[in-house]
A protein has these predicted regions:
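N-terminal glycine-rich anion-binding loops that anchor highly charged ligand groups
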Residues: 2-9, 28-46, 52-58
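Conserved, mostly hydrophobic/aromatic
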Residues: 15, 35, 88, 96
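Short, well-ordered coil/turn segments that N-cap beta-strands
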Residues: 2-6, 39-41, 69-75, 92-94
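Catalytic cores of alpha/beta
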Residues: 80-92
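Active-site mouth loops of central-metabolism enzymes
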Residues: 8-29, 72-82, 107-114
């Protein structure tokens, strides 16, 4: 067993994607800056998904570019498919989480990658 624990803060992605209204890029970047100031240095900053499906994650490319310029942390993003992966890479993502599903129905509805 390891003597270390690694905390990855997911609030800027998982928390904000469930808000009823989209949060501005400025507010998202400020949120991430406050997490860095609090000592959380590994942060999932957004998801490269369709803004029609999850409007709260629109402009994740701009959020990532801005926090990469600020620095001070390791910034992760989430992608559901190859299109999201390519967009994340183009935006400068260094750590990309890819989510998938064993359920064909879920994949068709949510990930659109079957």
């Amino acid at each position: 067993m390891s003597d270390q624990v690694r905390i990855i803060e997911m609030g800027p992605r998982d928390g904000l994607q469930n808000e009823k209204t989209p949060v501005s890029v400025d507010a998202r970047v400020a949120f991430i800056e406050s997490l860095l100031a609090a000592g959380l240095h590994t942060v999932e900053v957004g998801a490269f998904v369709s803004p029609k499906a999850i409007p709260q994650m629109a402009n994740s490319d701009e959020v990532l570019r801005r926090v990469n310029q600020i620095g001070g942390g390791e910034f992760h993003v989430l992608v559901p498919n190859e299109k999201g992966y390519e967009a994340a890479r183009a935006a400068g993502a260094k750590v990309i989480a890819v989510f998938g599903s064993a359920s064909e129905g879920f994949s068709l509805r949510t990930i659109r990658c079957v």
